[in-house]
Amino acid sequence: MTATLMDGRTLSRQLLESTAERVTGFHRSHGRRPCLATVLVGEDPASHTYVRIKVNRCTEVGIDSRRFDLPTLTTTEQLVRVLRDLSSDSAVDGILLQHPTPPQIDEHAAFEAIDPSKDVDGVTGTSFAAMAFGYRGFASCTPAAIMRLLDAYDVPLSGQRAVVVGRSAILGKPIGMLLLARDATVTYCHSRTTDLAAHVAEADLVVAAVGVPHLVRGEWIKPGAVVVDAGYNAGNVGDVQAATAANRASLITPVPGGVGPMTIAVLLAQTVDAAERHG
């Protein structure tokens, strides 16, 4: 068996095109364009690259973008003040705090300074609760991107056994909740899990989201399973040993070109959602 690649690039392009059409309609109706404010603290090269890509995608679809670059030694209090100011700015529809932030920053406090109505990255407690209880809100972008990929490839979820490797607040935990809402049977695995291989071997769907290169070995994958690799590590490799996993899985996301492009497209789509709610 050779797995079919889940093409995040093509799907993201389709979502960006539909988002651009929505931006045009919003501009026609409201006389302004949706606006995304991006806040970046420090000089991390990867973070600067990610922000540049997001700003470029905003330009492509017609979303106004504001970029705020803060010094590496910015304090939590200073960052919170910036985020609160943006939250109260009626011209801003969405706010993205690029993470990870420098170690002196209390990231939780920073996230909670974002108005939930502008939390288009889905990082506040309010957004997390909305995902858990099925309320209207903004899903964390990478989990939402994964769900779109699964739906695009008609992956059945109800009654299926899903194993999520990773328990971060913005990826592992929320993707598990979204899968649970679709009636999957979800198991979380993490650094303290014993016999990870046995858990993975029972999964119909594996979501790897732990940030450890090739942690999930290809021979662990159940024949015919679906594998979503949300990891992105040095050397352009994911959390899954892709070469061997592809010989057992039915569907697998490539790294790069799978989850990443869809995540950015979801961010922009949710920015337009926020603008439409703000009016």
Swiss-Prot record:
Keywords: Amino-acid biosynthesis, Histidine biosynthesis, Hydrolase, Methionine biosynthesis, Multifunctional enzyme, NADP, One-carbon metabolism, Oxidoreductase, Purine biosynthesis. Gene3D superfamilies: Leucine Dehydrogenase, chain A, domain 1, NAD(P)-binding Rossmann-like Domain. It comes from the Bacteria. Pfam families: THF_DHG_CYH, THF_DHG_CYH_C. Its EC number is 1.5.1.5, 3.5.4.9. One of its GO terms (cellular component) is cytosol. NADP(+) binds at G166, R167, S168, S191. One of its GO terms (molecular function) is methenyltetrahydrofolate cyclohydrolase activity. GO terms for biological process: L-histidine biosynthetic process; methionine biosynthetic process; purine nucleotide biosynthetic process; tetrahydrofolate interconversion. It catalyses: (6R)-5,10-methylene-5,6,7,8-tetrahydrofolate + NADP(+) = (6R)-5,10-methenyltetrahydrofolate + NADPH; (6R)-5,10-methenyltetrahydrofolate + H2O = (6R)-10-formyltetrahydrofolate + H(+). Pathway: One-carbon metabolism; tetrahydrofolate interconversion. Belongs to the tetrahydrofolate dehydrogenase/cyclohydrolase family. Catalyzes the oxidation of 5,10-methylenetetrahydrofolate to 5,10-methenyltetrahydrofolate and then the hydrolysis of 5,10-methenyltetrahydrofolate to 10-formyltetrahydrofolate. Homodimer. This is Bifunctional protein FolD 1.
